Amino acid sequence: MQLVEKLNALCASRKLEKKIVDKIADNGVLITFCVFTLMAILIRFSVKDFESGDYIGSLALWYDHFKTHRGFAALRSPIGDYNVPYQFFIALMTYIKVKPLYLFKILSCIFDFLLAIYSGKFVYYISSERTGESRSLKDAISNLTFVLPYGVVLLLPTVVFNSALWGQCDAIYAFFIVLSLFLICRKSYFFSFVFLGCAFAFKLQTVFILPFFFYLYFREKNFSIFFLLFLPLVDILLSIPSLCMGLRFSKLVDVYINQSDAYHYVYMNYPSFWAMIGDNYDYLKPVAIIITLMILFVGLLYIVRKKVDLKSADNFLSVAVWSVWTCVLFLPSMHERYAYLAEILIVILFFMKLWSEDRKNLGRICVVACVLQLMTCIQYGRYLFQNSYMNFGMTLILHTSVYLFFSYKLFVNGFQKNDETIDEF
C-alpha cells in the first residue's frame, strides 16, 4: 500500500514538474527579459561604491556647491561645464537624503534602461513592419526581436562602465537621439526634433548625429530644415527653471562655447585619426574640423547623386552609424566616451539585420560592433583602472582600419538598392 502511495506521489510530482517546465518553455522569452533586467540591476548594484576621477574631481564638487548654496537657488550661478538641464538634476539631488554618488549613478542607470527599451523597441518596430505583428510594448516583451537588443544594450560593457562605474550621463543624450530616430521612422517629425532638442540640451555631442539629419533632409525632403530650430528652443524651455532663478541668458550659450574649447588636445585617450599625426592643437584643430566637414560633405554628395534610399532600414542606420563615427574619428579633442552613440546604433543595426530577410553584411556589422566595443573598453580601462596593457598604437591602427573597412563596404557595395526587397519604414 505504501509503495502504491509513493508511486502516486512520484507521478504527481512529475506532473507538477512537467507543468513547471512547460510553463517556463511557454514563457521563455519573458523569463529571458526578466533575467536580463535582473542581471543588469545586480551588476550595477555591485559597483555602486566605485568613485571615478570625474566624480571626485567634478560631480561631487558640483553637488557640494548646490548643497551649500541652497539647492535650486544655486541655479542662478551654475558650476562646471555641464549643461543647465543636467545641473537642475544636481540641484534636485540635494533635497534627497541619499548618498550623492548613488544619486548620480541612479539617474544615469534610469536612462540606461530607457535607452535599452527604445533600442529594443526600434528593432521590434522594424521587424513588425515586415511581419505585421503587434507593436505594443506588452507584446514586445514576449518577443525576441525586442528582448535580445534590449538585453545586449543594457549589458554592453561601455554602457555599464559609463553609468555604473564612471557616473557619467551619456545614456541621457543617447536615449533622446535613439528616440528621435525612432520617431523619424514613424514619420513623427515634430516630436522627433523635439527629442533631438532634448538631447542637445543635455550634451553638445548631439552634433555628431546632425550630419545624418542633413543627409535625410537633402535626400528624402520629408521635413523642413527649420525643424533644426528646435535644438536651441528646447534647450531654452528646459532651462526655464534656471532662468527663473536668475540665470543670465548668455550662460546658455557660454556652456556650449566652454565645452567646445575645454580641452586643448587634438586627441584625448581615444584612438582618433589625429593620434597618428601629432598633438599640435593650435595648428591641427582647424585642419581636423575642415577635413571632417569635407568627408561628411563627400558622403552627402554620394548619397544625393546615387539616390541612396534612406527609407531602407539598413541604409538609414548604416549612414547614421557612419556619420557619428566619422565625427568621433576625425574631429579634434575626442575622448573615449564620445563613441557611445555609434556603439548603440550599430547594435541596433546588427539586430535589425539579424531579423531581416536579407542578412547580407551581418558578419561585417558584428565585427565592427565588437571592435568598437573593444576599442572603447580598452580606453575606459586606461582611465578608470589605469590599465595600460594594450598598446595605444595598436588600438589606433585597428580602429582606423575597421572604420575604413566599414566605409569602403558601405559606399562601394553596402547600400541597399531601391529595387531590392528591403524592410522599409
Feature roles, as predicted:
Residues 118, 172-189, 345-349:
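Specific aromatic-rich, kink-prone transmembrane helix
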Residues 208-233, 341:
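Perimembrane helix-loop-helix junctions
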Residues 2-10, 47, 252-271, 320, ...:
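Transmembrane helical bundles and short interhelical boundary loops of multi-pass, membrane-embedded
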Residues 24-57, 109-112, 155-157, 161, ...:
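Transmembrane signal-anchor helices characteristic of membrane glycosylation enzymes that use polyprenol
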Residues 48-64, 77-89, 263-273:
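Extracytoplasmic catalytic/substrate-binding loops of multi-pass membrane glycan-assembly enzymes
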Residues 161, 177-183, 190-215, 323-330:
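Membrane-interface alpha helices of multi-pass inner-membrane proteins
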Residues 1-44, 110, 124-148, 312, ...:
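Start-transfer (signal-anchor) and selected internal transmembrane alpha helices
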Residues 28, 40, 116, 125, ...:
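Aromatic/glycine/proline-enriched transmembrane-helix motif characteristic
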